[in-house]
């Protein structure tokens, strides 16, 4: 049986005086966390799946650290297209790996979380797994003793929404093939 995990994405935290589309991101995120704690106290883990910050500023990540102090769940942070790796690492220095990816075995399921941030793309919003990350994923899937669930900020299959599909994972066909060939996803 798969144990409960929580997935949240696109927090877009900003400095306290800045709204996005008429909403206060920090207030909305805190309300979401309160709801999760009230209605899902049995959740084993919380994955924050990228776009943690709106501008990728250190201040925005510092706001996130303050919020995370009150979260009752073990939490994994992932990066999205609005995040900036150097500023993230300045605030979260205990994340020593080059990419913010890894896996957790939760029950008899391996949850693999990918770092799809592509900081060198001409379209800064699209995602990519460079060859190093593709190799890591292939190896991680091969070594898994359990079925695998894969999490990523950028989607790998066309959604039918043109605006979103323009910023999907650029090498999605390669990644989808690796996932299918593994027989574990």
PLM features per residue range, with description:
Residues 58-138, 142, 169, 174-183:
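Extended active-site neighborhood of metal-dependent phosphoesterases/phosphodiesterases
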Residues 50-55, 83-84, 156, 166:
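Short histidine/acidic/glycine/proline-rich micro-motifs that form metal-
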Residues 1-63, 142-144:
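N-terminal active-site segment of His-dependent metallophosphoesterases
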Residues 14-19, 86-88, 120-124, 158-162:
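A short acidic, helix-capping loop that chelates divalent metal ions and anchors anionic groups
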Residues 1-3, 51, 94, 119, ...:
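Homeobox/homeodomain signature
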């Amino acid at each position: 049986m798969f144990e409960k995990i929580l997935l949240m994405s696109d927090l877009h935290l900003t400095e306290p005086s800045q709204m996005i589309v008429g909403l206060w991101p920090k207030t909305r995120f805190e309300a979401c966390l309160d709801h999760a704690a009230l209605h899902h106290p049995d959740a084993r883990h919380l994955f924050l799946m990228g776009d943690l910050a709106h501008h990728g500023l250190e201040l925005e990540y510092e706001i996130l650290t303050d919020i995370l102090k009150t979260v009752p769940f073990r939490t994994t942070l992932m990066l999205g297209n609005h995040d900036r790796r150097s500023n993230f690492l300045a605030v979260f220095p205990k994340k020593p790996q080059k990419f913010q990816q890894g896996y957790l075995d939760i029950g008899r399921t391996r949850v693999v979380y990918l770092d799809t941030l592509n900081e060198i793309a001409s379209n800064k919003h699209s995602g990519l797994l460079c060859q190093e990350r593709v190799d890591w994923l292939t190896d991680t899937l091969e070594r898994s003793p359990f079925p695998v669930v894969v999490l990523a900020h950028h989607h790998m299959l066309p959604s039918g929404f043109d605006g979103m599909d323009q910023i999907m994972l650029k090498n999605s066909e390669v990644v989808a093939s690796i996932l299918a060939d593994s027989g574990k996803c």
